[in-house]
Amino acid sequence: MKERKVIIKTGLNLENSYTSLPEIFFTRQSPSRVPSPKLAVLNYSLITSLGLNAQVLQSADGVEILAGNKTPEEAIPISQAYAGHQFGHFTMLGDGRAILLGEHITPQGERFDIQLKGSGKTPYSRGGDGKAALGPMLREYIISEAMNALGIPTTRSLAVVTTGESIMRETELSGAILTRVAASHIRVGTFEYVSRWGTVEELRALANYTLQRHFKKGYDKENPYLFLLQEVIEKQAELIAKWQLVGFVHGVMNTDNMTISGETIDYGPCAFMDVYDPETVFSSIDIYGRYAYGNQPNIATWNLARFAETLLPLLHINPNEAIKIAENAVSDFTKLYKNNWLSGMRAKLGIFNEELEDEYLIEDLLSIMHKYGADYTNTFRALTFDNIEDTVLGGKVEFDKWYKLWQERLTRQEEAKLSSKQLMKSSNPSVIPRNHRVEEALEAAVKEGDYSVMEKLLDALSKPYDHSKEQDYYSKLPEPSTCPYQTYCGT
């Protein structure tokens, strides 16, 4: 398809460094034309931080670019190749419905991928139509922006446009395209792909590119590829800990959904936990609970082991030594994760200093919460504002005993009680994207064309630590239901 190159002053300052890699990593591919694109939602705060022109992006020409009907002059549209272990099984994948326009360089010199998701068939579509539905694209917009506000590394959503076409899934749905912004789209699955089907030199090219883009300090190290492995492990330890601290269940932790940059990616079957339960699963296809909330750290370790395997030819000339180096690096994940998680949990309880018994104090609280079906987010909110009596834990003897131990623990630090409260307020969100509130917003937008419900939700989610009365509506639990909430891989 001939590219429709245009000069439109959107503020996009595109480079195409990924195309400097060997051609095994991508295929030149233009977005498919759509009949009647209309702007559904535009992320003005992200536009500002990227140095883009909001007025132009929301104009007719800007919408044509966001829909893929027109291509910025500097863009070299590509779809990226990658593989992945999906539910433990290796398979060839790739961008089946996404086109990378290029890398936007911000006025501050930062580099971000600009990708159109739902932009048509690619060589990696595997029989799919390459399209996306409006509901799942809006859902990714909501959740990714909520994650960003919570301080969790994530891809961002710049815009969603409707395409004016219908797509067939179980039923007929409105088509849409999401503009995703990411530090990069390099995945563990990208390395798995070249490890399986490429040469060692192509693997080295990808590793060098990744070092240059994300870990430049690695060039000065004795073993830069070990440094790469260690940095990815550290970033994932930090990321997974942050997920656990807010009760986020990703739902599809396949290796193609683990980024090298340490950002959360792919918001298909994800959801936030209400009642605390380590076995919480939302994805309709995760029937054995592989990606359950409590198993996410273990899956991260497994994924990182797959990443380490791809780097073996680069880690050492002796295969046995390479394996030892990789195993030692991956074995560090558990400690790194636990340190990050414990640090975050201490903050949620207003604890500044470290004591060996802290882990037992934390685990005892979680055990009590699990036993009585306490809401994860609202329990910590209640502890922050001293109104635990309003929760299911109020009046429970076990909790009262724990509470006394916690209060005693707070006396064993120099910081004043007021400082502890401030720490808790900045560590315990009052509002998360509750599943029923997200569905409420999506139903209004998709079925009725009313985006006001979504806009109000996004406003509340943008200030999770403000603890204002206006947020109370979004912190309320769903009505008791006999049907557990389920998610699907729509995004």
UniProtKB/Swiss-Prot annotation:
Described purpose of this protein according to its UniProt entry: Nucleotidyltransferase involved in the post-translational modification of proteins. It can catalyze the addition of adenosine monophosphate (AMP) or uridine monophosphate (UMP) to a protein, resulting in modifications known as AMPylation and UMPylation.
Entry's EC annotation: 2.7.7.-, 2.7.7.108
Name of protein: Protein nucleotidyltransferase YdiU
Active site location: D256 (proton acceptor)
Gene: ydiU
GO MF term list: AMPylase activity; ATP binding; magnesium ion binding
Coiled-coil annotated spans: none
Keyword Nucleotide-binding: yes
Residue numbers binding Mg(2+): N257, D266
Keyword Magnesium on entry: yes
Binding site for ATP: G94, G96, R97, K117, D129, G130, R180, R187, D266
Species for this entry: Clostridium botulinum (strain Hall / ATCC 3502 / NCTC 13319 / Type A)
Enzyme class at the top of the EC tree: transferase
Catalysed reactions listed for this entry: L-seryl-[protein] + ATP = 3-O-(5'-adenylyl)-L-seryl-[protein] + diphosphate; L-threonyl-[protein] + ATP = 3-O-(5'-adenylyl)-L-threonyl-[protein] + diphosphate; L-tyrosyl-[protein] + ATP = O-(5'-adenylyl)-L-tyrosyl-[protein] + diphosphate; L-histidyl-[protein] + UTP = N(tele)-(5'-uridylyl)-L-histidyl-[protein] + diphosphate
UniProt family annotation: Belongs to the SELO family.
Keyword annotations of the record: ATP-binding, Magnesium, Manganese, Metal-binding, Nucleotide-binding, Nucleotidyltransferase, Transferase
Cofactor or coenzyme needed: Mg(2+); Mn(2+)
Pfam entry (one): SelO
InterPro entries noted in UniProt: SelO
